[in-house]
């Protein structure tokens, strides 16, 4: 059996004294949509930076297409990135280029194609996301949902083997969100790619993911199909899946006794300013 496109083993990573990951294991099967979920601040986007070599792990191993990301030189890492398409959280469109030229940008940077071939390629990708008619518009003329779709067309223009989505549903209205969900599913099926979707939108992911991982406090606390996670008896998993305001992830930030805190402040206010 061949190795999965993405394999993460015993991943450790910290920012200063703050641990972000402490022994994370993840497998992303070929041709499937894998969801990576977790509360805000759990390091989901950081995980993508580590996966694509934008940051280096403190310990552990990250394999992309069977190669250890941490052991690659710049040239080899660059070659692997060309096999990967990424939809950034903010879309990251170039504001001074038309929709057409935004999608064409990676092709112009990495390949030398006749203009007729390039045009056919770009228009085909825009057609796939429903925006061929918007090819000559500027990014400032697009809605948030349209901009996200243009960015997706750009992500697939080089026919990647792996598609990575970083919070693809953030800031979208229900219709635009439904469009993105549909596109993720359809592109995965028609292009035969492997997809990683990083998000905390449980309902949307449940409709498209083959397998889900839930991160919390630096570890994978649950892994399985969306249905298996929904049936989990683990308190932290149940809280996240149901959206409960309090639980293992507490409502209150850690603090001392309220009465003592108020009383202490009141006593300080009574002291002459020179004695504070």
Locations of the language-model features?
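Conserved ABC ATPase signature
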Residues: 138-142, 146
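The feature captures the beta-strand-to-loop junction immediately N-terminal to the Walker
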Residues: 37-39
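Conserved catalytic motifs of ABC-family nucleotide-binding domains
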Residues: 159
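Helix-to-loop junction immediately C-terminal to a conserved catalytic motif
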Residues: 52
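Catalytic Walker B motif of ABC-type/P-loop ATPase nucleotide-binding domains
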Residues: 163-166
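Conserved ABC ATPase "signature" region
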Residues: 67-68, 115-133
